[in-house]
C-alpha cells in the first residue's frame, strides 16, 4: 500500500502573478496565447518563441532507466491550509489535501493546461469559499460531446478511497508502460492555424511554428496520450446499484464510426455515481482488434479538476488532427480513453487512513488512442510552480520520511525537514534521493547520522545544527561536492572527519564540546573560507591545522595562545575572531596574515600588542581589542594605513602614541573606560574621524589641533574632568577650544542645566555662564526646610565657593527661568562683582547702585524675580532669588548713559534696564517672612486626580492598587512614611524614575505625589501581572520555548538600556516578580525601589520580604574607585556588611552583594542568570530554603543545578552569568546578541 511521506508546504510561483479574486472567481493571468505560465523544475514556457524548454536536461533524464524523473510542484501559498498529507503510491504519487489541490509531474515538462488552447476558453466558474474547497477546470465540449449533467452529489467516504487505491494498483503496469513508451517517442507535430485541437496544449496555432513539439521530442515526451479523471466534485453513492455513469460519448475517426458504448451506462468500479464522458478516438493506422482490449495501455495524464471548463473544441477537430496523431504515435499507442468523472460536491479529505486510489473497469472501445504528454496532473492549482524543494518543516514529524520510488522524488534538489522531532534516520533513507543537493534538518532531536549518507553524492549543503549529535560518521567525509556543513549547537566532542571534503567552504561547529582539532581532519579543507569554532572547549589548536581559510571564528575556546604557528599557513585569511578565549598573549604567527581585513581579540587577558604583528597587518580595516589588559598601543600602529575602525575600550591604556595620528583613514575610535590623561597633540591629523568616544578617562582638555577634525559627528566625553557643557556636543567643544575665556555670548542657543544637588559636592568654584542657564533643584536634598517649613533657613556656608568669572555677559537671559523649587541661596560671602557685569547690551541688568547694594549686603535691594509674577506672589516676602533669569517685565524702564574717552575719542554708551517691582529683605533674620506658598514639583501628580480600585499587591512597606488617573488605567504604589528615611527612599526612587526615558521594556512612569502620611508612585498598569505569576500559576497559559527566549530578550534589552545612561542605572532587584508581562507577551522591568545611579551618593535596599515588589529601608552606598558601588552599613564594629535581617533578595543576588562588596551592572547580570534558570526550569529558585543557607551557598560558589536537557545556548549564558567574579560575567549587550541569534535559529528558516 501507499505510505505517508510527510506534510506539504507550498507557495506562490516564482516569477508569476498571484491569482486575483474578482467577483468570486480566481483568475489566472499567467495564461497567455493558450499556455499557462507555469515553470517546471527544469523547464518553462518561452512566450517569445511559443515553445517549452528544459534547463539542465542532463539532470532531468535518467539514462539508466530511460525515464524522466518526477517532480512534485509545491510552493508556499497565501492560503492557510491544514492537515494536508502527501502520499507515496506505487507508480504515481498523489496529494490529498483538505483545502487545496496539487500537481504532480512525471516528466518535468511545463505544466500547461491540456484542455484549452486559448485564454478566453479557459475560465473558472466556481469560487474558492473560505479556503475549504478544491478547485480546478472542466473541459469545454462542443455539441457532439453532449452536455454534462450536473447533479448534486456527496463527498467521498472511506470505501471510495479504497476503490481509488485499487484502481491505481491494478493499472500501475499500464502507467509504467505508457511512461516508457512516451520516452521513446520522437515526433514533430504541426498544427493547423484553424485547428482548435487541445492535444495537451503542445500544438501551436501557427502552421509554421514547431518549436513546442521540437522541445517535446528532445525530452522524449510525446504529446498525445491522456486519461483525465475529474474528481474535484466527485459524487459516490454507497448503494452499488446506483453507481453508474450517467453519460458517455465516443468520437470516432475519419470513418465516423460511433461506438455503441455511447448509449451504454458503464460501471466504474462499484462506487462511482457521476457524470462520465469516455472519449475514444480511432487511429486509421491501427486495427479494430486493438480496441477490444479492456486494458488501458497508455495512460499519461490524470487530471483531477473542477467541472467548470468546457472542452468545446476538442471534438470538432478530431478528424483534422488524425494525421498529426498518426505522425506522433510511432510507438504503437493503441488506446486513448479519456474519462471524466464530474460532479458538484467538493472533496473534503481529512482522513488519516491510506490514500484514495480510483478503482474502475473501463469498457473496451473499437478505437485507437492518441497520446498526450506524460505527467500526473492533480487539479489546476494556481499556486504551484516548478520547484525543486520539498518543504516538510514544522510538521511535528517523529520519523524521517521514506521515499520508496525513485521516479517520484528524484527531481527534488532540496528537502527541508527542520523544526520537527526526528530522532533518527533509517539506514536506507537516502537510497532514492541520491540526487539531493541540500538537506536541511536543523532543530530536530537527531542523535546520529547513518553511514548511508554517503549515497548523497550530489549534496552541497547539509544542515544538522541544533540537534543532539554526539559523533559524525566517517562516511560523511565522502561527500566530495559538499560546500557548506552546519553542525552547531550539538554535543560533538570530536572534530568531524573531513576525508574528501575538498570543496568545503563553510564549516560551522559553534556551541559544541570539541576539545581538539586533529591535523588530518583539517588538511583536506583546502577551499575552506569560514570556520566557526566558537563556544567549544578547545584548549590549544594543533599547529598546522588549516590552510586557505577566509573566515575563522574560535570564540570561547580557551585556546591559551590561539594555536601558535597555525596562522602561518592561513595566508588567505581575511577575518579572524579570537574573542572570549582567555588568551594571555597574541601569537606571533599572526604576522603572516597579511591579507587580514578584520581582527577581533576582545574579551581576553592580553596585555601587550606585539609591534611585529601590528606592523605586518597593513590591510587591516577593523581592529577590536576591547576588554583586555592593554596598557599601551604599539608605536607601529601607524602601519595600519587601511584601518577604519579601532576599538580599544575597557583596557588600562594610559598613553596614546603619536603615531596613531597618522591613521589617515580612521573613522571610528573608541577609547572608553581607560586611564588616558591626554590626547596626542596631532590628533587633528585624523581628518576623516567621524566618531570619537572618550567616556570615563582622565582627560582634562582637548588639544587645539582637534579643531581640524572637521568630519567628526559624534563625541563622548562624559566621565572626564572636562567642562560640564561638553556633553552638549561638538559645537560647544569647538567654541571652548577657540575661546578659552569662554565668552558664551554667541551660545545663547545652548541651555545647560546646573543640578543644584551637586553644588555641595563641588571642591572648586563653579562658573555660572550666562546665556540661558537655569538652576534645577529637583534632585537637591539640602535646605529642604525652604520647601517644607515655609520659612527661609538661616544663611549657610554652602555656597561660599561660588565665583563669577570676569568677563561675564548675561544678555538675552529670557531663555530659561529659575526653577521655583530651588532653595534660597545666601549672598553675603560673594566676592566683589566685576565691573564687566555692567552690560550695556543687557536691558534687564541692575543699575550700578543696585549692584553696589548687593555687594555691600544692604538689607534692602531691588532685583528681578523671574520665578513669579507680581500678581501671584505675596507683596512682602521672598519667594526665590534669580541671578540670571530676569524673566519679569517691569512697568517702567530706566535708561542710563555712560561716557568713555578712549584714545582721545569720547564714546557714549546708553543702557536700559527694568526696575524691580518690589523690595525684599536679605538679612539673616526670618522674622518678617511668613509661610511660603506650596511648591509643586514637575513630577508631582494631584492626589485628587487619582481614583483607587482594588488591591493587587502588598509588601512589607507598601501596597499596590489598580486605579485610574486622567482616564488611564494605572498601578498606584502606596508607601507609608514611617520615618525620614522612608521619605528619602521615596524621593530617590522618584528621582530615578523621572530620569528614565520611554522604552518598550521599562514600565512607564507617570508621576508621584504625597498625601497625609503616604507617598504614591503612579505607573503603567499591566493586567497580566508578573512573569512569576505566569510561570508558577497552574491555571495560566503554558509557555513554549520560543516565548521564553523572547521574554529573556526583553529583560536583556531593558537592562542594557539602563546601562547606557550616564551614569549607568543599576536595578539591583531583578527577579521575576519585578518583571511585568504585557498583553502582547512582552516584558517590562518594574520596581526601581532599590535602583541606583553609578558614581553618585546612592541608597540601596535589601528587601526583607520574598513576596513584595516594593520598597523597604535602604543602606547608603558610596562611590568606589573603579566605578562600582559599595553597600555600606556600618555596624558597631565599624565594618561593612549587609543587613542580615533582609536576605530575601539573596535568592537572586550576586555573591559580591552578599559579601558586602561593590555592585555594578554585572551584579544585575548574575540576577538575570537566575531569571533565565527560572524560565528554563519553571521552578522557583531555592524554593523553601532558608535565606541564610542560600547566602552561604552562593558565597561559596554553589549554584542551582541546570537541567541536562537545557538548550546549550541558554545553558552557556546561565553559566556565564553565574561566574563568581563579576568581571568574568558577560554584558547585557553580549547576552542580547546571543539570545537574538538563538531566536533567529528558532523562528527563521535558513534559505539557501
Curated annotation (Swiss-Prot):
It comes from the Eukaryota. Its EC number is 2.7.11.1. Residues 102-117 have a biased composition (Polar residues). LRR repeats lie at residues 386-407, 411-432, 435-457, 458-480, 481-502, 503-524, 527-548, 572-593, 595-616, 619-641, 642-663, 665-687, 688-708. Residues 181-216, 860-873 have a biased composition (Low complexity). Residues 1-26, 40-61, 100-125, 180-220, 235-338, 825-873, 1106-1135 are annotated as: Disordered. It catalyses: L-seryl-[protein] + ATP = O-phospho-L-seryl-[protein] + ADP + H(+); L-threonyl-[protein] + ATP = O-phospho-L-threonyl-[protein] + ADP + H(+). The active site is at residue 1069. Disulfide bonds: none annotated. Transmembrane segments: none annotated. The keyword ATP-binding applies. Belongs to the protein kinase superfamily. TKL Ser/Thr protein kinase family. This is Probable serine/threonine-protein kinase DDB_G0278509.
